[in-house]
């Protein structure tokens, strides 16, 4: 398989398939796809971890559970993420795992809004 063929195959993958591929590559090569963390952030020296947490601007919305409201949660996940039915169902079924990220890098207001919608549908959600 040429490099171009591999790239085309990756382009045709769904979000769920890409997440599985990344996980498999991490396991196979013992690496992490997470962005490297900076050792020191200019301008925050001497700030306690609690204060840094308060100043956080980008959030990750993580699905922790869905109780007995799976269908309602799937509908809301589809609305928020624009995923297809199968991809949204697969994502909801990953609830409680590190792969159950509904959306990441969102501002606090949007993250709170997403959390509220999901909780109204019966989901248990965490903002990170």
Curated annotation (Swiss-Prot):
<keyword id="KW-0689">Ribosomal protein</keyword>
<protein>
    <recommendedName>
        <fullName>Large ribosomal subunit protein bL12</fullName>
    </recommendedName>
</protein>
<dbReference type="InterPro" id="IPR014719">
    <property type="entry name" value="Ribosomal_bL12_C/ClpS-like"/>
</dbReference>
<comment type="function">
    <text>Forms part of the ribosomal stalk which helps the ribosome interact with GTP-bound translation factors. Is thus essential for accurate translation.</text>
</comment>
<dbReference type="Pfam" id="PF16320">
    <property type="entry name" value="Ribosomal_L12_N"/>
</dbReference>
<dbReference type="GO" id="GO:0003735">
    <property type="term" value="F:structural constituent of ribosome"/>
</dbReference>
<dbReference type="InterPro" id="IPR013823">
    <property type="entry name" value="Ribosomal_bL12_C"/>
</dbReference>
<dbReference type="GO" id="GO:0006412">
    <property type="term" value="P:translation"/>
</dbReference>
<dbReference type="InterPro" id="IPR008932">
    <property type="entry name" value="Ribosomal_bL12_oligo"/>
</dbReference>
<comment type="subunit">
    <text>Homodimer. Part of the ribosomal stalk of the 50S ribosomal subunit. Forms a multimeric L10(L12)X complex, where L10 forms an elongated spine to which 2 to 4 L12 dimers bind in a sequential fashion. Binds GTP-bound translation factors.</text>
</comment>
<dbReference type="GO" id="GO:0022625">
    <property type="term" value="C:cytosolic large ribosomal subunit"/>
</dbReference>
<dbReference type="InterPro" id="IPR000206">
    <property type="entry name" value="Ribosomal_bL12"/>
</dbReference>
<dbReference type="InterPro" id="IPR036235">
    <property type="entry name" value="Ribosomal_bL12_oligo_N_sf"/>
</dbReference>
<dbReference type="Pfam" id="PF00542">
    <property type="entry name" value="Ribosomal_L12"/>
</dbReference>
<keyword id="KW-0687">Ribonucleoprotein</keyword>
<comment type="similarity">
    <text>Belongs to the bacterial ribosomal protein bL12 family.</text>
</comment>
<dbReference type="GO" id="GO:0003729">
    <property type="term" value="F:mRNA binding"/>
</dbReference>
